[in-house]
């Protein structure tokens, strides 16, 4: 883990030198190990990588996919914004996260398999969260799924 972390920090440093304004770390497989194990063993390395960007005054976004209840372990010492997947209600994620950490995502990418009316209802419901939470960045809770109707995205 040390070697991967050091290589990642070198990557972060080069990205910052190249002029990025924000660095996002994806922990796509975060949820496949128990929360306690991830928090104790892996999160310190993620924090180190994110802190490398923060130390250079670069904003940070952390995406710990499926971390769910573990979101309570994320604070402003780890990242500026936490990106969340769609498998936890956004209100629950906001409650678990430290108030000083912004929130991004939560849109279920499977919604694009629905018809336009269903998509519209879903978006009205989701964006109402943003009306009450100005630190929320609208985004998918993960990437687009192959096979979606691109017209539904428009």
Regions found by a protein language model. Give the residues of each.
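Active-site loop segments of alpha/beta catalytic cores
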Residues: 1-154
